[in-house]
């Protein structure tokens, strides 16, 4: 029991420390893509910039909107972070105190539930920008989650089990590019960052949050980014830390290179392009592997 608690705490420490440094890594990559240096003043080459930014955020005052439910407003960011944290337990590489036989099904439940935290956070903030961002996130999730579930079902058919594990198979490379599009949509990253949409919605669903609540939302967002980089490494390339950071770099460069889609084009892309392709992949694995 004590060993299990120690491993759970170590996973949380690992995730939070990783988030601190991948955010710094992202800011340097975005700076390089725009021909500027990026953060380089705090300590050696800005190495501790993310830690000082976190301390500064924690010192800010948390303001609750006048007509908002204070309890819901405070609880939602914590639930958002917990959902992200639970996602790490579907990958059997960071702990050894249990065997998760149906980790893929548990993962589908988590990503289905995660959109509710975004939706509720926008609703309880009583802000028109937050509300529009929440509605966008919910309709966006309906668009990609069906295709995403079918892709994972095709992978289940291929590996003949409901548990994530590390393997390397060339036949799954055809699924990688569509999977990348759906990961971008799940993470609300450009070009599918409609829930935030800085140029349209100020900051979207988290526009009213500050201090600890914003830190939890931030940790949840970037923790999910790091998790999906790890998941992609596990599914398509074998578990490798090099592949994890290569995948993270790809996600950052997509943000710096591509503008935001039009909302109707995003819906059309997932419903009429990726969904039929996912059905084709599923039919292929069912017919030729069984």
UniProtKB/Swiss-Prot annotation:
Keyword Nucleotidyltransferase among UniProt keywords: no
Catalysis performed (reactions): a ubiquinone + NADH + 5 H(+)(in) = a ubiquinol + NAD(+) + 4 H(+)(out)
GO cellular component: mitochondrial inner membrane
Keyword Mitochondrion part of the UniProt annotation: yes
Bilayer topology term: Multi-pass membrane protein
Leading EC class: translocase
Family per similarity comment: Belongs to the complex I subunit 1 family.
Protein name: NADH-ubiquinone oxidoreductase chain 1
Organism: Ascaris suum
Lineage: Eukaryota, Metazoa, Ecdysozoa, Nematoda, Chromadorea
């Amino acid at each position: 029991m004590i060993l299990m608690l120690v491993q759970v705490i170590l996973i949380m420490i690992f995730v939070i420390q990783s988030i601190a440094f991948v955010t710094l890594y992202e800011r340097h990559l975005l700076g390089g893509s725009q021909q500027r240096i990026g953060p380089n003043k705090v300590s050696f080459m800005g190495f501790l910039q993310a830690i000082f930014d976190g301390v500064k955020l924690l010192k800010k005052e948390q303001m609750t909107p006048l007509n908002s439910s204070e309890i819901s407003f405070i609880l939602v960011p914590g639930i958002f972070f917990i959902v992200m944290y639970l996602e790490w337990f579907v990958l059997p590489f960071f702990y050894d105190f249990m065997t998760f036989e149906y980790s893929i099904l548990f993962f589908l439940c988590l990503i289905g539930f995660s959109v509710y935290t975004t939706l509720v956070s926008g609703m309880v903030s009583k802000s028109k920008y937050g509300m529009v961002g929440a509605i966008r996130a919910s309709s966006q999730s309906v668009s990609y989650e069906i295709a995403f579930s079918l892709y994972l079902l095709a992978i289940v058919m291929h590996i003949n089990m409901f548990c994530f594990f590390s393997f390397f198979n060339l036949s799954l490379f055809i699924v990688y590019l569509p999977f990348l599009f759906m990961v971008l949509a799940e993470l609300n990253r450009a070009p599918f960052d409609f829930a935030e949409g800085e140029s349209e919605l100020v900051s979207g669903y988290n526009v009213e949050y500050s201090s600890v609540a914003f830190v939890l939302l931030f940790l949840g967002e970037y923790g999910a980014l790091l998790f999906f980089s790890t998941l992609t490494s596990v599914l398509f390339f074998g578990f490798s830390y090099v592949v994890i950071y290569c995948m993270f770099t790809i996600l950052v460069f997509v943000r710096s290179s591509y503008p935001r889609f039009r909302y109707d084009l995003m819906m059309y892309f997932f419903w009429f392009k990726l969904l039929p392709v996912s059905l084709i992949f599923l039919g292929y694995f069912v017919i030729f592997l069984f």
